[in-house]
Swiss-Prot record:
Keywords: ATP-binding, DNA damage, DNA repair, DNA-binding, Helicase, Hydrolase, Nucleotide-binding, Nucleus. Pfam families: MCM, MCM_lid, MCM_OB. ATP binds at G356, D357, P358, G359, T360, G361, K362, S363. GO terms for cellular component: MCM8-MCM9 complex; nucleus. The keyword Hydrolase applies. One of its GO terms (biological process) is double-strand break repair via homologous recombination. This is DNA helicase MCM9. SMART domains: AAA, MCM. Residues 719-737, 826-835, 1024-1042 have a biased composition (Polar residues). It comes from Danio rerio. Residues 702-718 have a biased composition (Low complexity). It comes from the Eukaryota.
Length: 1133
């Protein structure tokens, strides 16, 4: 069907009237242009045109190829009419243009006219709009679309149009078209090789591809050729998202004999609308700029809160992750590109690498950033090659063309690469030039050129296996140092399995079902896109103060011992400058201030993974602060004090004070997730709390947050844990735990501690006035891993530490305390006939006078260490058959009574007189050595070599020991067994003892070469016989570091006569306390003679449960004189 002449004239008249009414100003502007040979478009909205005249719309949809030339002719007549009728201005100002074209846009949104997919054969001849992405652009060509021919017979000249369907080839005429009808078929082409072409125009072909997000499931994107002519040439470039308005046509190459005709479908474009530039063009609107200016004017007293409001609108489906959102926003804002004095171009785009465990939201940030950026490409590293990332050479129609890759397609925009470490190594090195020099040099298929890649790269990758904080980031992600140094920021997101974080995230996802919450404070995606396009037009300048902070921080990073060589290069200083400019853009400022520099240093510290200021920060667990100004104040103090810029700190704090004084009220953070945080966040001040500096706010209970003390963030140190300066909460926890343990300890319980002789001696030396303390004393100043003790005792020990200025916490951090089971004491039932006076006497023995000498304190400690199973322990002692001479000498010397007039003799005599025991002379007479009889020798051998447990001899021995007079038998048994045991130990470990003796200091060496009697600091005091009796179970080596066995404290039942009742129960034998003073005399004798053996490690027990022990509740772990060298045993708690 063809249009009639009447329809053609009607369509032309209607369109001319429409143009004169709606586009008169556009035509006048075109007529004022000086150049007449250019092609000028007049964009006409199809919806408006069809509303004015429906018949024109119907004809246009039915015959678009016929109607469009009619529109162009009508436009020419309208322009001529406007030029002639204009009398307000001189005629010479309007120049008639012959190349004016009508461009149709704004088709009705319906499936018949608007397509998201590539048209098919049934769409041929229809005017459609197709949306896609430009993947290839060809070079611009000169197209000859018309030729002049002359008839050789009648000399008639006529024009021949090139056939679009046959790739603009010319078909020679078969007959003369003149009216005379000469019938000649011979013609001469006037546009020969010598003559210039009569009519030419620009021609270009581009290829578009369907957008992936608009495809159905499982579909592969298809592509289509678009024909551009005249003013449409070079209107778009590779990577642009465009909407093409045009006519779907078929074309084929000229047919030849025995050649198959290949028909292809192309779209002859009438108008191209670049979707990327829509947001940019909308920025010129004054109302949008005014809206953003009013927003920042409302936050002039707290600009950080306004910035956080923008960050909350960035990827709102991800909860928290404050540092990551801030870093992504600064990267999207970008810095200012500049050219230095030497002419070298310094890039302004920043690059960001997100390294994290699976499920930490890395891909969500990449997708959102690609959506709000006008020009972006999103790809994955697993399917990317060198040619796919840079450029590929493709041969099409006998010619080589360059197809742009992901980096070239994203020129001037954003390139998001997921799974960055999946790119092959030789392909990964190809993007080095694109990231730093922002160009790609190509030498392929005879084409040598350089393409621009002025793009921002936002990459995400998973660590290689489990992230190891002890190695560098390049090893964890398997990326080379040259590539890693090109990233301005590298944020590590570690999933530390924090229970509070898991609870918040699960509640946030389930309650909102993954959708962003409906909140008035969140910006829409269109508004975010418009804002980031607007701030990219700003060009902030760096102030000298900001330059000082950035340069000082760079120098500090270079001098850091734990610095990463791949990150701390000169590129780091350029990155700091770019990020500072980006933050100034984000704050809608034209100047880079101290605030921008401090924030950039804070984010860089999170990126360095072992920074010079605070170490490591897990960016995953950072959330938005309730008081942004207070958080910035804390950051400012930490950064500037560490950098030594106190003058800048004072000025900045004054500026912040002025802002706070000027604002009407305290700023409230419009955190969209605050409800979830307040409802679901519990206090994280428990034993497994992750500690860190007050750097970025994170999980914390709202009740524990004050304005003066910013909340401690829940961060995970990836290398070395950083101890926070404020340990108040931890001390409170320890105080509560210690008191809880103290409350659970009953009178029957005691705690077993294993210590060395040297440690025990030092402990006894310093315990003078630490017996009775109040229960309500504070434990905050004493950090102890020991057993619970009385509060009054802790108070005195705390005062001792305050006076000495020592930090016991530091002393105990290098030791490991191993828990052991506590041993319960049996309740010793007191005899009903025991008077109250005797009970008070035992308590008095438990607390001797504070002014007692060293010997008195030693006796108190040793008395406390009596074991109830002494008889069984004697059975295990192995007695050598032939003791050495030294051992025999020791045994003989240990049995000698003290000399008359000696110090030990006077003490022993006084004690025996006070207790009405056997006189000392009788004891000495009974202990004189004499030739033993055969029967006695046999008895001694049976004692020294105990029979097997449970045998008849064992039972007989027990009965004999029970019935033996309690004057000398138990003394002989203990003395002989202790001497033989000491002799065996000397024989069994000679090398070990010798090495330990040589390692001692001269003042501590008590071997045979230094046989000097030890002198105590204080004179020995009087000791009760009951105390001496309990020492009979221990062997003393003559050293100041007394030996003690691994015993369990038991309080013997008190009898009416002042003695001790004997309980004959299998393993429990308690001896009579009479005639036991000889043991102390023998011990003193050994000290005077100076005959000692090597150091041996023994254990003793301290009771903390009540009155069961003689020394109540002392703990060696709280000693104020403990040094690292004192801990020569394995500590057990």
């Amino acid at each position: 069907m063809m249009l009639s002449p009447d329809q053609v004239s009607l369509i032309g008249l209607v369109f001319e009237t429409y143009v004169m009414e709606h586009h008169k100003s556009d035509i006048q502007q075109i007529l004022q242009e000086n150049t007449e040979d250019l092609h000028y478009p007049v964009v006409v909205n199809a919806m408006t045109l069809f509303e004015d005249n429906m018949e024109v719309g119907e004809c246009f949809n039915a015959f678009p190829s016929k109607v469009l030339p009619i529109f162009d002719n009508a436009l020419q007549r309208a322009a001529q009419a406007i030029s002639q009728s204009s009398s307000s201005s001189p005629q010479d100002t309007f120049r008639l243009k012959h190349n004016m074209h009508v461009r149709i846009s704004g088709l009705p949104v319906c499936p018949e006219l608007t397509r998201d997919h590539i048209p098919k054969a049934r769409d041929v001849g229809h005017f459609l709009s197709v949306t896609g992405t430009v993947i290839r652009t060809s070079v611009t060509k000169v197209l000859e679309y018309e030729r002049d021919y002359m008839c050789n017979k009648c000399r008639h000249v006529f024009s021949v149009q090139a056939s679009f369907e046959q790739f603009y080839t010319f078909t020679p005429p078969t007959s003369c078209p003149s009216e005379e009808g000469c019938g000649s078929f011979k013609f001469t082409c006037l546009s020969g090789s010598d003559a210039p072409p009569a009519a030419c125009k620009d021609y270009q072909e581009i290829k578009i591809q369907e957008q992936v997000q608009k495809l159905s499931v499982g579909s592969i994107p298809r592509s289509m050729l678009i024909i551009l002519e005249d003013d449409l040439v070079d209107s778009c470039k590779s990577g642009d998202d465009i909407t093409v308005y045009g006519v779907v046509c078929q074309r084929w190459k000229p047919m030849f004999q025995d050649c198959r005709c290949d028909v292809e479908i192309v779209l002859k474009a009438n108008y191209i609308e670049v979707n990327n530039e829509q947001s940019t063009t909308a920025l010129v609107l004054e109302d949008i700029q005014k809206e953003f200016e009013e927003f920042w004017d409302s936050h002039k007293h707290d600009p950080i809160a306004g910035r956080n409001e923008i960050l909350m609108s960035l990827c709102p489906q991800v909860f928290g992750m404050y540092v990551v959102k801030l870093a992504v926003a600064m990267v999207l804002a970008g810095g200012v590109q500049r050219i230095d004095a030497s002419g070298t171009k310094v890039r302004g785009e920043s690059h960001l690498l997100l390294v994290g465990d699976p499920g930490t939201g890395k891909s969500q940030f990449l997708k959102y950033a690609a959506k709000i950026t006008p020009r972006s490409v999103l790809t994955a590293g697993i399917g990317s090659t060198n040619a796919g990332l840079t450029v590929a050479a493709v041969k099409d129609s006998g010619e080589w063309h360059l197809e742009a890759g992901a980096l070239v397609l994203s020129d001037g925009g954003l390139c998001c690469i997921d799974e960055f470490n999946s790119i092959k190594e030789h392909d990964r090195t190809s993007i080095h030039e694109a990231m730093e020099q922002q160009t790609i040099s190509v030498a392929k298929a005879g084409m040598v050129c350089k393409l621009d890649t002025r793009t921002t790269i936002l990459a995400a990758t998973n660590p290689k296996g489990q992230y190891d904080p002890n190695v560098s980031v390049s090893v964890n992600v398997a990326l080379a140092s040259p590539l890693l140094s090109r990233f301005d920021l590298v944020l590590v997101l570690l999933d530390t399995k924090n229970p509070d974080w898991d609870k918040i995230i699960s509640s946030f996802i389930l309650q909102n079902k993954g959708a962003p919450s409906e909140s008035l404070c969140l910006w829409s995606m269109e508004k975010m896109r418009a804002y980031f396009c607007l701030i990219k037009t700003l060009k902030p300048r760096i102030t000298p103060e900001a330059n000082t902070i950035l340069s000082r921080y760079y120098q500090l990073q270079r001098q850091s011992d734990s610095r990463n060589a791949a990150r701390t290069t000169i590129r780091m200083l350029e990155s700091l400058s770019r990020l500072a400019e980006a933050h100034a853009r984000l704050m809608f400022r034209e100047t880079v201030t101290v605030e921008d520099a401090v924030v950039v240093v804070s984010v860089m510290e999170c990126s360095m993974q072992g920074g010079a200021l605070l170490g490591n920060v897990n960016a995953l667990h950072t959330s938005f602060p309730d008081e942004p100004c207070e958080q910035y104040k804390t950051q400012c103090e930490i950064v500037l004090e560490r950098l030594g810029l106190s003058d800048l700190l004072q000025r900045e704090l004054q500026r912040l004070s002025g802002l706070q004084n000027g604002r009407p009220g305290s700023p409230k953070s419009p955190q969209s997730h605050s409800e979830h945080r307040n409802e679901n966040t519990t206090s994280t001040n428990h034993s497994n709390q992750e500690l860190g500096l007050n750097w970025f706010h994170s999980l914390s209970s709202s009740s524990n947050i004050t304005s003066n003390n910013p909340p401690t963030p829940v961060i995970t140190s990836t290398q070395n844990a950083t101890t926070p300066p404020d340990m108040t909460s931890r001390n409170q926890q320890q105080q509560a735990s210690v008191w809880a343990k103290s409350a659970d300890v009953s009178v029957e319980e005691a705690v077993q501690e294993t210590v060395s002789k040297k440690l025990r001696g030092k402990r006894l030396k310093e315990m003078k006035e630490t017996l009775l303390l109040s229960k309500d004393d504070d434990l905050e100043d004493i950090f102890s891993h020991s057993t619970p003790m009385k509060n009054s005792k802790r108070k005195n020990m705390a005062d001792t530490y305050q006076e000495s200025g020592e930090d016991l916490h530091d002393k105990f951090t290098n030791f490991t305390f191993k828990p052991r089971e506590k041993m319960s004491h049996a309740n010793a039932s007191t005899s009903t006939s025991a008077p109250e006076k005797q009970k008070r006497k035992i308590e008095t023995d438990s607390h001797p006078p504070a002014e007692g000498g060293r010997a008195n304190k030693t006796l108190r400690m040793e008395t406390h260490s009596k074991n109830k199973t002494c008889i069984e322990s004697e059975k295990d002692a192995i007695i050598p058959e032939a003791p050495k001479k030294q051992g025999v000498k020791k045994n003989n010397s240990s049995l000698r009574p003290p000399a008359e007039g000696s110090r030990a003799y006077k003490i022993l005599r006084m004690e025996t007189q006070n207790t009405n025991l056997t006189p000392i002379e009788s004891v000495r007479d009974s202990m004189k050595p004499e030739a033993p009889k055969k029967q006695d020798v046999k008895k001694n051998e049976s004692i020294l070599c105990p029979p097997a447990e449970g045998s008849r001899a064992d039972k007989t021995l027990r009965m004999e020991m029970y019935n033996t007079p309690k004057d000398v038998s138990s003394q002989l048994l203990n003395d002989d067994s202790s001497a033989q045991k000491q002799m065996f130990e000397d024989k069994e470990h000679p090398q070990q003892l010798l090495s330990r003796l040589n390692a001692l200091s001269p003042g501590e060496n008590d071997d045979g070469s230094n046989k000097k009697p030890l002198k105590t600091d204080h004179p020995k005091a009087k000791v009760a016989s009951s105390t001496l009796a309990k020492l009979s179970r221990f062997s003393f080596t003559g050293s100041s570091e007394e030996q003690a066995g691994h015993k369990t404290v038991q309080t013997p039942p008190v009898a009416a006569n002042g003695g001790v009742n004997v309980v004959a129960t299998g393993s429990e034998k308690q001896e009579n306390m009479t005639n036991m003073s000889m043991r102390r005399e023998i011990s003193d004798r050994q000290e005077d003679d100076g005959e000692t053996a090597g150091r041996k490690r023994r254990c003793f027990e301290l009771g903390s449960g009540g009155s069961a022990g003689l020394i109540k509740g002392f703990s060696l772990f709280s000693s104020s004189v403990l040094d690292d060298e004192d801990f020569d045993d394995v500590w057990n708690w």
